[in-house]
Amino acid sequence: MATMRQMAQFEMGVVFAALLCVQALHAEEQPSYRVIPLPVPSHVILEVTGLTAIGDGKVAAATRRGEVWIVHNAYDNPPRALRFSRFAYGLHEPLGLVQVDNAFFVTQRTELTRIRDRDQDGEADEYITVAKGWGVTGNYHEYAYGPRLDRAGNFWLTLNIGMDKNALGPHTWRGWGIRVSPRGRITPVCAGMRSPCGLGANADGDMFYTDQQGRWFGTNGLFHLQQGAFYGHPESLRAEDLVNSDVVAPKKLPEGKTVAEVARLVPSYRLPAVWFPYEKVGRSVTDIACDQTGGRYGPFSSQLFVGGFVHSEVFRVALEKVRGEYQGACFRFLSGFQAGIVRLAWGEDGSLFAGETNRGWNSRGTRSYGLERVVWTGRELFAVRTVRARSDGFLIEFTSALDVESAARKTNYSLKSYTYTYHSRYGSPEVDTRQLAVTRARVSQDRMRARIEVDGLREGYVHELDLRALRSAQGHELDHGCAYYTLNRIPSP
């Protein structure tokens, strides 16, 4: 994540453009979703860094200070019967939490740990090392994130790069994504990460991670975890010879070129499935939660929800696979949370829990940490549900019927494309920007989709769609009227 000084380098260049398209809507102002803060007792410092629902009305939360707390009656509304009990303590900055059978698994700085309560008194009495050995130097920025489970029962972890060159020991796997079998066997999978805070699977079971704007990363991104992939940060390649990995180090880094050009020049380099344009869609990205609630969280089934730290918000991502590559659109979704969101977890009732802390970096909000629950009210909203690429444009699906007159007018669609520079400096402005002409707009018979034809689509570029001129059949404006589609592959005709 960025320091305040580093973030300030880009503020003046992006704020004006962001204000044109960003429609920041506080959580309490969104009638389709209600945010319920869970009051935390004064003796509990709930700086949430791991979060999972565990059934029977309870949620478990790991904290930066090395504790695991059980929140009882977590679904009580209003939350008057909440009770907090400490399950575990003494951990080294756990940054994730999952439950498997009757045990919790957390990733500490130095190891993946299994925690159990063998005598069933409500407190952990067994701490077992499952896997370790990825290397830690003591640098503050060497966070270890996870675990998250894949469908095969493997644990996935991601490892931060140290903040300065003095922190880079020759025998550490900093900047790597690793898979750990249930028996503790470590397999290094991919490299090139910077600050890979979020992990999660999509509806098809493929694993993804989020990374932060910084050196070699022009802005924040959502990346598909793939065997042998290199995501851009070269300092991770120090470990290439230490492990039996498929990652092939590029002979020369094409610094100064656009990321689209780098993807063509370096076979192992992988673009993100989605870029989150800086400031327009937050300043940082954290956890990943795939909506498999069966509609209990609204009209976005199978989509990803992604936490935002600095702006204390949640974003939404709609993915598709085109010519073997993931790509898709991101949207602002819900803001106004009480602190920076680090972890997300689905509740047993289909609600979404957000675990929060502003530790280390400033975030918007009224508190330093906390836990909130987001519930769909059932009220219809007018929003872009998905954007799908076509060989000559885009197919845009909405959550409610369109006003045909506004949606059939091609001048009501404003599009541009841009990309980022691959370099060792901190972040990148939007570069090589082009305005795109919409040559035709058509509305489907059921009025739920608009098909637009666009001149000048470009692979490897973000395509920004400003749709704020559209109206619903009832005359309503769009809830967040901009979509940001990362076009890695143009579909075949």
Can you annotate each of these PLM segments?
Residues 395-401, 453:
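Short edge beta-strand/loop segments characteristic of extracellular beta-sandwich folds
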Residues 11-23:
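Bacterial N-terminal signal peptides
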Residues 443-446:
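Blade-terminus and WD-like Trp-Asp/Gly-His loop motifs, strongest in beta-propeller folds
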Residues 479-493:
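Short beta-strand elements
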Residues 399-440, 465-472, 481-484:
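Short, surface-exposed alpha-helix to beta-strand junction/turn motifs within ectodomains of secreted
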Residues 456-460:
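Surface-exposed, short loops/turns at beta-strand junctions within beta-sandwich domains
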Residues 27-381, 386, 390-393, 404:
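Beta-propeller domains with acidic blade repeats across secreted/periplasmic ectodomains
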Residues 2-14:
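Bacterial N-terminal signal peptides that target proteins for export
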